[in-house]
């Protein structure tokens, strides 16, 4: 007797459910995506016990015809594709015909639906088996209730996390779908309490404010790019707004939320040297492309996709984000504790530059007196959580209030930071400077690190024949495997100024180096660059030069607790203003922080 047998439908559906229905959030995702495909404009999701007890999804979409209701719970039954060619031009979120039978097989499911052209249809299924059916109201749309989830698969139920964790996954799903479809009104309630709401007016900025809070939304800037193959729209947060994980990076492709590691890397490369190590940005990208360029039929959950022009897309994303920051002032603002009302009038304020005398010739600064009249008004402060959505209705927000404020991201015609006039130094580490806009605090090490980094980056990209012989040639010995690896990348190292000659068994000798190598650090730099090659295994010239420039700039920059003369401070600030990115060091730490005059006056209660 043969050993191979065909599985019955109930068991096959449970196996399929293991891939499609991982947790309550998976059920919500599949049902809401079906509602979106049905052209719904209002979608409401109700949960009890994070969906483990009950999930209800109500929409005003097209609804089901009566005969379609029964067929919808058969495996691989779908209205969204008809033949093999349709797989290459998928424009809907669902297409596999697995969601409803998979969900029904591991739960109790009740369906009420109508096309609005007569009485609707009512079905009840338990474990995928039809137990009741009849008529219901003619309200157009669909109402699906899923209860007793995983009642017949206790092993899956055993691995569910806490209510709080499972609820967080559901909120995450709704957040991303709301961003992908801002023209749809979403409402999410849990145990009778509203957690999230959007009005469906099509304004992505209001959805961002509902998810991340008004403060974060104000610090996100719009981006746009278009080529023959791709159109990119979205919002990216300023580099000062970061998170510890990539969970806050949302990428939508043709209306579908996806996860793609190479796209994440491209986004972060767009923030090159603007992010601190180990931190990630908050971003929302909406990418449109021809369906022929994307394969979504990779996994039943449809989160993983493949692109046929992945390199071109990554380069466009990287370039678009990088260009969005090139004309922006990225100086973090320090804000005082918020107050609900401010005085209608304010005294005029003047400032003067205080220049310390030094033993050396210091540039003289003309004292400037400028009167500023501040016109303030009553402000209504909407407190929004950065991580979770409160109960406030975001539709109450003025659309313009979500646009990044000009003082945070103002565009500069000539210079990315204004002229700064030094006041002095604090603890031999921070430079204090001022201008008519307030007080600036500059990290002197980070500032010079940025200056040196851009200098060394340019030098490393230029081939030079101006070499300086080493007084005592440097001999380097490695293991056999390391020697072979270094030998294979000698040309790349030479392009960066490290000239290696084989010298005996598993050894190299270095006789000279470029003249621009920092004096006294030549040997350390050569050894460090070879170490980077050994760590990288596969050497990329751009990455090698980048790491070398960062390493050199860090070693050569002034350190903390190093006191500077006035002329040195002036020179440092002027050099910083001439850099291409004067806001962060190569490691992504901020260089300069701004206290506006208004914020200082709030701190000292001069403005109440």
Swiss-Prot record:
Recorded GO CC terms: mismatch repair complex
Protein family according to the UniProt entry: Belongs to the DNA mismatch repair MutL/HexB family.
Descriptive protein name: DNA mismatch repair protein MutL
HAMAP family: DNA_mis_repair
Gene Ontology molecular functions: ATP binding; ATP hydrolysis activity; ATP-dependent DNA damage sensor activity; mismatched DNA binding
Keyword field: DNA damage, DNA repair
Protein's UniProt keywords contain DNA repair: yes
Gene that this sequence comes from: mutL
Role description: This protein is involved in the repair of mismatches in DNA. It is required for dam-dependent methyl-directed DNA mismatch repair. May act as a 'molecular matchmaker', a protein that promotes the formation of a stable complex between two or more DNA-binding proteins in an ATP-dependent manner without itself being part of a final effector complex.
GO biological process, one term: mismatch repair
